[in-house]
Curated annotation (Swiss-Prot):
This is Pyridoxine 5'-phosphate synthase. The keyword Cytoplasm applies. Its EC number is 2.6.99.2. 1-deoxy-D-xylulose 5-phosphate binds at D9, H10, R45, H50, T100. It catalyses: 3-amino-2-oxopropyl phosphate + 1-deoxy-D-xylulose 5-phosphate = pyridoxine 5'-phosphate + phosphate + 2 H2O + H(+). One of its GO terms (molecular function) is pyridoxine 5'-phosphate synthase activity. Pfam families: PdxJ. InterPro entries: Aldolase_TIM, PyrdxlP_synth_PdxJ, Pyridoxine-5'_phos_synth. It comes from Desulfatibacillum aliphaticivorans. 3-amino-2-oxopropyl phosphate binds at N7, R18, G188, G209, H210.
Length: 235
């Protein structure tokens, strides 16, 4: 039975499209929690394309479950995290030209800087997750760097729905749990593809945003969150 953390970035995307102050992702965070979600996720990107600094600060003050801050491992973002103190920081790679995060963090390549970021955040009382591709070398590197959690990038599977991509996720999840890390999963998961994860018991929590916000346009945020939460609980 997996948990569900809901990403409200795309509520902010809609707001920023018109440069107005609505819809407010802060209000969305409240509704997400009232619907029963296990946490709220926001990605404060360096270019501030959707979530803004004030969103992070206000959501941190009002959230009753947990706030997960997705962020690049830059001095600026680490400083903000230490000030805001989210319940969890998820380190992700970032490219300004990408529409959304395109791949996992290369912990093997950047092991020293990632380990330093993890140490700094943990010293501030923040649990640290690394968003990584389902690759065994990345899992081993994440563990060696000191991560508390790995969030497995599920984008390849959600695009292809291939048995090979699912097998990679299962293998990575098993290894991560074996070495003592929590296992989360996210990216590209919708109301159909989440059902393919039934039986992957190593996954403890899903991080999902776009598909929930998209469904909410038609049936409302409360109903969309509850529908996805029911599916996550079956995993």
């Amino acid at each position: 039975m997996a948990g569900l953390a809901v990403n409200v970035d795309h509520v902010a995307t809609l707001r920023q499209a018109r440069g107005v102050d609505y819809p407010d992702p802060v209000a969305a965070a409240v509704l997400v929690e009232l619907a029963g979600a296990d946490g709220v996720v926001v990605h404060l990107r360096e270019d501030r394309r959707h979530i803004q600094d004030r969103d992070v600060r206000i959501i941190r003050q009002i959230v009753q479950s947990k706030l997960i801050l997705e962020m690049a491992a830059t001095p600026e973002m680490i400083g903000i995290a230490l000030e805001v103190r989210p319940h969890q920081a998820t380190l992700v790679p970032e490219k300004r030209e990408e529409v959304t995060t395109e791949g996992g963090l290369d912990v093997v390549m950047h092991k020293d800087s990632v380990a330093d970021a993890i140490k700094t955040l943990q010293a501030g009382g923040i649990k640290v997750s690394l968003f990584v591709d389902p690759d065994l070398n990345q899992i081993k590197a994440a563990h060696k760097a000191g991560a508390d959690v790995v969030e497995l990038h599920t984008g390849d599977f959600c695009e292809s729905r291939s048995p090979k991509a699912m097998a990679a996720i299962q293998e990575a999840a098993r290894l991560a749990r074996k070495v003592g890390m929590e296992v989360h999963a996210g990216h590209g998961i919708d109301f159909r593809s989440i059902q393919d994860f039934v039986g992957v018991k190593e996954i403890q929590e899903f991080s999902i945003g776009h598909s929930i916000v998209s469904r909410a346009v038609f049936i409302g945020l409360d109903a969309a969150v509850k529908e996805m939460m029911a599916l996550a609980r079956q995993v």
